[in-house]
């Protein structure tokens, strides 16, 4: 029997899988709440842009409400029992649960062979092994080090992007799994040997074959997405089309993923078992541009009729919506875009622009947006919300916030 879903059902299924089916406002968010949500999502994308807050903090706020960012810092970079995560290339630079470390070993082996990494870094790995071994020895002898501690470069210009040769060596060793990220100093990575960072039991686990690991990554992607096309599934952990299609066929044949038709989708989709679609889902949140609900832009357009592009690197005069625009999820639909900035020197959360989608934003949506903005400002330690944008919608929001 062929399964089919309406577009509205697919949206609710996707939102529930992504953690938008729970109670957002708790009296206190505890470590276990973060651990449970991270297990559902599978990973958090890391990005250096700090216009609002580092992107890896936002997805948990969107789903759980205000929480102590120290909890995530401890989970990601502490020493001891509170450490639950590690950094690696999942969906771009990512934080992943420690138990998923064995699932990435095949990718580390490929990186060591110059596969699946930037061409310039692969070339560096082929040409600069003596320097790479020197850098590894320095870390072995001195402990966790950042690129700044090793750099001998006197000038900014050089043949390897704008990185020092030592930074390239560290990045190559990280990609190859010979080093890992022990912590961060500010936003600078501190690299150390995996055996000095991770439990011995974790490193001693048997390695999976590439096929086994890729099947598990696709299973986890399907669980995190709820319903997804082959391209959606492979994008979650950045598998190649060849890797994804072969493993997907095996999972379907084994009955672990079920094909499903979604209204309006031209490509077949897949679910991890018989879909359990929530009858109603009224989730509302401001979303990071790097949130796993929207990071695959074609999927966001298919699910929500929401065409979304990040305009950070677009010249100001050519931007349509703004520099750092967060989609606004209201009652399970993406209804608006908010260009936000944390202006810490002025202790305010500034709305530089506000745009509604074609169906507009009614008073109830604006009141919910105002609550989201107040909550975010308090979470970031900012005293006020300031509406800098112009237009009728901004005027209405300003009135709601008064």
Regions found by a protein language model. Name each.
Residues 1-402:
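Long, charged, low-complexity, helical-prone intrinsically disordered regions
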């Amino acid at each position: 029997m062929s399964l089919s879903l309406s577009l509205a059902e697919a949206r609710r299924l996707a939102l529930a899988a992504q953690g938008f089916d729970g109670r957002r406002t708790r009296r206190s968010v505890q470590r276990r709440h973060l651990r449970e949500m991270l297990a559902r999502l599978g990973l958090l994308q890391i990005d250096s842009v700090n216009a609002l807050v580092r992107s890896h903090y936002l997805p948990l706020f969107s789903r759980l409400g205000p929480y102590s960012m120290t909890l995530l810092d401890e989970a990601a970079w502490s020493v001891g029992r509170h450490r639950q995560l590690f950094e690696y290339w999942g969906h771009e630079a990512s934080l992943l649960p420690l138990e998923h470390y064995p699932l990435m070993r095949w990718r580390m082996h490929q990186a060591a062979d110059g596969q699946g990494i930037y061409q310039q870094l692969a070339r560096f790995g082929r040409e600069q092994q003596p320097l790479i071994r020197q850098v590894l020895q320095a870390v072995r002898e001195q402990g966790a080090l950042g690129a700044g501690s090793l750099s001998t470069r006197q000038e900014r210009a050089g043949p390897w992007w704008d990185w020092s040769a030592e930074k390239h060596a560290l990045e190559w060793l990280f990609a190859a799994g010979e080093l890992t990220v022990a912590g961060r100093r500010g936003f600078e990575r501190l690299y150390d040997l995996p055996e000095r960072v991770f439990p011995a039991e974790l490193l001693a686990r048997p390695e999976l074959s590439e096929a086994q690991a890729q099947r598990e990554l696709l299973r986890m992607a399907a669980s995190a997405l709820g319903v997804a096309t082959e391209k959606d599934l492979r994008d979650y952990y950045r598998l190649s089309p060849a890797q994804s299609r072969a493993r997907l066929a095996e999972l379907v044949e084994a009955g672990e993923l079920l094909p499903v038709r979604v209204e309006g989708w031209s490509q077949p989709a897949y679910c991890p078992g018989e879909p359990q679609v929530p009858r109603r889902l009224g989730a509302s949140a401001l979303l990071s541009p790097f949130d796993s609900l929207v990071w695959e832009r074609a999927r966001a357009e298919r699910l929500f009729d929401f065409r979304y592009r990040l305009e950070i690197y677009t010249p100001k005069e050519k931007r349509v919506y703004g520099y750092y625009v967060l989609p606004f999820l209201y009652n399970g639909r993406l209804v608006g875009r908010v260009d936000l900035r944390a202006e810490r020197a002025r202790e305010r959360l500034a709305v530089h622009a506000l745009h509604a989608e074609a169906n507009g934003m009614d008073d109830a949506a604006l009141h919910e947006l105002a609550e989201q903005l107040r909550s975010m400002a308090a979470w970031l330690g900012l005293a006020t919300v300031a509406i800098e944008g112009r237009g009728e919608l901004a005027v209405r929001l300003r009135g709601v916030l008064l």
